[in-house]
Amino acid sequence: MKNLFLFMAITLVGLGGCSEKRSQPLAIDNSLTQEEIAAGVLSPEVMWKMGRVGLASLSPDASRLLYTVTWYNMQENRGVTAIYVRDAASGEVAQLTDFSSNNSDPKWNADGSKIYFLSDRSGSSQIWEMGADGQNPRQLSKLEKDIEGFGVNPAGDKVFYVQGVQVADRKSSDIHPDMAESKARVYDDLMCRHWDRWDEGEYRHIFIADLTSGGIGKGVDIIGEGAEWDTPLAPYFDMSEIAWAPDGTRLAYTC
C-alpha cells in the first residue's frame, strides 16, 4: 500500500510538472548563428527558424492588419501560433498574444474595437475576444470539444462555429462492445481512407449560437443530426467556404 501511494505521488508530481511546462511561454530563438550566416545556405535548420505566416484580417477602416505567425522550437519538438497586428501607415508591428498558448483565426468586430480569435489557453480550442490592443482577453465559449473555426455576424449577436460530430461507428469495438480490444474498422461504403486520414465516423458540422455579453449560448447543428458529410468540405476544411450574409441573418456554406 505504501508503494502504491508513493507511485501515485510521483505520478501526480510528474503530471503537474508537465502541465506547468506547457503553461510556460515556449522559448523561440529565430536568430541565425554566425556559421549559418557565413554559409549562406537555406538549410533545414534555417528554415525551421522562420515563422509561418497564417490567416490575415484587415480592420474595417483598412488601417490595421491582423495576422498569425507560427514559430517552432526544435529542442522541445513543438510550435506555437501567435497573433500580430500591423499598422498600415507606419508599418509598426505589435504582438498581441504570447507564446504560452496557441492563438489563431483572428477576426475584427464590426467597428474594429475588438478582436475575436481561437485560443487553447483554457485547455481546448475555444472562442475568445480581446481589445484591439490585445488587452482584456475573455473566453466566450466553453464547449466540451475543440472548435475548429468560427465566424461572427456583422451585428455581433450571432456566431457560427465548426466542430467534429461523431455520427457513425466505424470501430469494431464500438459496434461490438464485447470486443473491446479489437482494432478493426468496419466499412460498408467508400471512401474509408483519404491520404493519411481514416474515416472514423466523425464529421465537421456547423453550429449557430447567440452571442451575448455573457458569452456564446448553446449552438444548433444546422447540418442535421446524423448527417454523414462535412462542411466545410474535407480534406482541407477551409473556413472560407462559410460566409454570413451582409445583413447577418443568413449563412452560405458548401457541403
Model regions: which residues?
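Multi-bladed beta-propeller domains
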Residues: L26-R52, R78, R86-N102, M130-D146, ...
